[in-house]
């Protein structure tokens, strides 16, 4: 026996692509840590040869991640989409595409911070290359099964997102992430469910609580004391527990549930932590991410403070 095997019906291939500066290198490093075989900047002409190359029998089930972007030799998005279709139609391959997106202003900031030049604008402003690349990549973005917007992600946030999406889930359960965020700092682009916690009274306007977060006991107690808190949060928990088995039956591999308040530091943080604890008590294993927890409190983001009349009614 040769000790080699051709890729079988369970072979898994993930094409990792997207805008320059959006995080492809970070994604490939995490996938490698998760046990994937990783190849970056592969010329498009070699893609099929790589997929069909014999592998050792013990590694036949190892998933393969291939990084391809505008720097790759022979890169043409429309042609790549066509080749993916052909490879799928050939059977025996689970081929998916992950596209990393990011807002132009944030990409400009990243290129400026690292002092790197955009690959499509070596002698021009980065904004020119970003705009050109975005237009070029649009066919791939529309085609991709997985689109992750990294605009508001730190490196750690992106690493966690990749682990949630492409780590091994147990017993067919979807990978579950609970996220808190601030509406004033942008909606999360990848959430399946979004709950607005701004109806609860806001600890930001209490000088003693403003510097704290929803993880602090005194802030949590303030939020819990809202007359609407227990009834509404309990209803949200019941809804989520009803939906999760249905998501599993539908075959969803990951579910992100987001809780937002104005700044993302108080109400949403507390409620997200409570819901995550409730889900753990029901046998789930969610990860918990607080997107804006480390952001500085800003009065300008929180709107107008409650009126004196409202404060006298207990909504401080």
From Swiss-Prot:
Highest taxon of the lineage: Bacteria
What name does UniProt use for this protein? Nucleotide-binding protein Sala_2050
Region annotation (Disordered) maps to 283-316
Query: Is Lyase set as a keyword in this record?
Result: no
Q: Which UniProt keywords apply?
A: ATP-binding, GTP-binding, Nucleotide-binding
Q: List the disulfide bonds.
A: none
Residues bound to ATP are 18-25
| InterPro entries the UniProt entry points to | P-loop_NTPase (IPR027417), RapZ-like (IPR005337), RapZ-like_N (IPR053930), RapZ_C (IPR053931)
UniProt key word ATP-binding: yes
Q: Which Gene3D superfamilies match?
A: P-loop containing nucleotide triphosphate hydrolases (3.40.50.300)
What is the annotated signal peptide range for this record? Answer: none
Annotated residues that bind GTP are located at 69-72
Q: What does this protein do?
A: Displays ATPase and GTPase activities.
Which GO molecular function, any one, fits this protein according to its record? Answer: GTP binding
Classification of source organism: Bacteria, Pseudomonadati, Pseudomonadota, Alphaproteobacteria, Sphingomonadales
Report the family membership: Belongs to the RapZ-like family.
